[in-house]
From Swiss-Prot:
It is a single-pass type II membrane protein. It is found in: Golgi apparatus membrane. InterPro entries: A1-4-GlycosylTfrase_dom, Glycosyltransf_32, GlycoTrfase_DXD_sugar-bd_CS, Nucleotide-diphossugar_trans. Keywords: Glycosyltransferase, Golgi apparatus, Lipid biosynthesis, Lipid metabolism, Membrane, Transferase. Its EC number is 2.4.1.228. This is Lactosylceramide 4-alpha-galactosyltransferase. Catalyzes the transfer of galactose from UDP-alpha-D-galactose to lactosylceramide/beta-D-galactosyl-(1->4)-beta-D-glucosyl-(1<->1)-ceramide(d18:1(4E)) to produce globotriaosylceramide/globoside Gb3Cer (d18:1(4E)). Also able to transfer galactose to galactosylceramide/beta-D-Gal-(1<->1')-Cer. Globoside Gb3Cer is a glycosphingolipid of the globo serie, one of the major types of neutral root structures of glycosphingolipids, that constitute a significant portion of mammalian cell membranes. It is an enzyme of class 2 (transferase). GO terms for biological process: glycosphingolipid biosynthetic process. A motif (DXD motif) lies at residues 166-168.
């Protein structure tokens, strides 16, 4: 009886939590990489820039994988005038030096990229999320890491404004002309993998209130895509997303803007494609979401004609060179 119960528990955990993230990265990587002699992006002017771009790592991991590296590099290259801030919970605070990892070494080559520690208690301070975060500390929930990420991104947008991107995006175009915008994933749901909002926008305040008032950490997406969809429907007084694309200063962009390939078709990123088709395929796309939850661990040859390999080569060439050397 015990053996069977233990086996079932393990299988449930495996199904809910998923396989280890790095199952596809079993090779040994060097801790440092020499910066390439490429024309570097123009460093941004000092002082607070209104268009900061934020990436988040809410786990304690400090070794960005190649897709993470490509996300940040592609954002840095398309936004040379912006600060690209990579906030990682596992980084030490104070004046401690950064951990020695290939990803951190490579991303440090870009003058507009900063790797900074993420202090969640400080981020949530003076927001409706502070009490929720204190309460959730002592309990186990199946989706706590993604839920922490959901909370962190809306707190960042509320407190600082700018652009938030998940670490499984490849950025194709400059995003600075987008303000108070989020992307539509499908006919029925919005997605917060990309957010662009002004600081202290009322929509983000409503998101934080809904996060706490209707909290349920046991349903996948309830605090993320479903939350944004709920709040947008209330914001616009609509029942269906089809009724309105924009209202009261907040705009939703169609799926091709950020989610041109639906999550159900994630394997298309690993299929060969004619390079001449790329511009047509993504003519209406700002950034490509790769659905890492589905695709993680899927291997591809960096030099192949796979769609993902071609996107790496074009939009994050420094990461792509590292992949060719070490994959």
């Amino acid at each position: 009886g015990f053996k069977f119960t233990f086996f079932v528990s393990i299988m449930i955990y495996w199904h809910v939590v998923g396989e280890p993230k790095e199952k596809g990265q079993l090779y040994n990587l060097p801790a440092e990489i020499p910066c390439p002699t490429l024309a570097p992006p123009t460093p941004p002017s000092h002082g607070p820039a209104p268009g900061n771009i934020f990436f988040l790592e809410t786990s304690d991991r400090t070794n960005p994988n190649f897709l993470f590296m490509c996300s940040v590099e592609s954002a840095a290259r398309t936004h040379p005038e912006s600060h690209v801030l990579v906030l990682m919970k596992g980084l030490p605070g104070g004046n401690a030096s950064l951990p020695r990892h290939l990803g951190i070494s490579l991303l440090s080559c870009f003058p507009n990229v900063q790797m900074l520690p993420l202090d969640l208690r400080e981020l949530f301070r003076d927001t409706p999320l502070a009490d929720w975060y204190a309460a959730v500390q002592g309990r186990w929930e199946p989706y706590l890491l993604p839920v922490l990420s959901d909370a962190s991104r809306i707190a960042l947008m509320w407190k600082f404004g700018g652009i938030y991107l998940d670490t499984d995006f490849i950025v194709l175009k400059n995003l600075r002309n987008l303000t108070n915008v989020l992307g539509t994933q499908s006919r029925y749901v919005l997605n917060g993998a990309f957010l662009a909002f002004e600081r202290x926008h009322e929509f983000m305040a409503l998101c934080m209130x809904d996060f706490v008032d209707h909290y349920n950490g046991w349903i996948w997406g309830h605090q993320g895509p479903q939350l944004l969809t709920r709040v947008f429907k209330k914001w616009c007084s609509i029942r269906s997303l089809a009724e309105s694309r924009a209202c009261r200063g907040v705009t939703t962009l169609p799926p091709e803007a950020f989610y041109p390939i639906p999550w159900q078709d994630w394997k298309k990123y690993f299929e060969d494609i004619n390079p001449e088709e790329l511009p047509r395929l993504f003519s209406a796309t700002y950034a490509v979401h790769v659905w890492n939850k589905k695709s993680q661990g899927t291997r591809f040859e960096a030099t192949s004609r796979a769609l993902l390999a071609q996107l790496h080569a074009r939009y994050c060439p420094t990461t792509h060179e590292a992949m060719k050397m070490y994959l």
